[in-house]
Amino acid sequence: MKHKLLKLLLLVELVILGVTLNQQVKAEEAYDITKVVATAWVKSDGSLIMKRQITYDFNDDVHGVYYQQNLAKHQEIKDLHIAVQDNNEEPQAATNYSVKQTAEGDRFKVYHPVSEDSRLTVTYDYRITNAITNYQDTAELNFMIIGNNWNTDLDHVTASVIFPGPVKQLKAWAHGSLNGAIRVLPNQGKIIMTADNLNGKTGIEVHTIFPVSVTAANKNIVRHKHRQAVLRQEAKLANEANQKRLRGRIINWILIVLGLISGLAAIIKGFSVKKQGVTPEKDVGFNS
């Protein structure tokens, strides 16, 4: 029993050490991303007008930043504009940047020197073609609005999908952070997603369906029904997410209990060592 308890305490210590080391690694990045705001405006032709604002706090001197927009095979980026804002100055159009097409999408690199302890906000404006698919009974947008390949966590994230007006039968789901929130506002034609301390490898995916009339000019058409398949899929994913949340809560409680046991065992061990210690002999005086 004693050996089992020692093994259990060792496991708890290893878990705590792993969390501590992970936090130390994250702290060594050259920058923090304190804020990301991504807004997608839905257009009648099935494209999205995107605005991305990314705010960096730098811990070191750097020569620039980059962002990659992943794309499907039939999608393109049009009308790209980039602006940079140093600290609290007015935004300026970026003139020194490059765009590289990769197998995954387009990679934007902005050449802009930044010194240590500075803040930089980069704004990307562009259009993504063929972002929405029109089916016979619904239109669908399934889009990674916040990517999942960042080198650091994102402190505060807001992502929105905005329609031209109110949208009846608007349904939407967000996938990624289990601690995030989504608000679906059919009367305002908006979907708003928020998350704090978003893991850089998690991202946020928005999945929404709405009437085909919203994107009536869309030429990206699939001639079969799809709405019920989406509803079944999202019901399954919601159940899986709830099970994952439950497992997470159980693990947290187990770690808390193990921590209490570890602390209690340390206290008991301290008393036991004190009780079993050797009583020192009294000094004996002598004459020479």
Identify the role of each PLM range:
Residues 272:
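Gly/Thr-rich phosphate-binding loop signature of adenosyl cofactor/nucleotide-binding cores
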Residues 2-4, 21-170, 174-268, 277-288:
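Lumenal/extracellular ectodomains and adaptor appendage modules
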Residues 9-20:
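Bacterial N-terminal signal peptides
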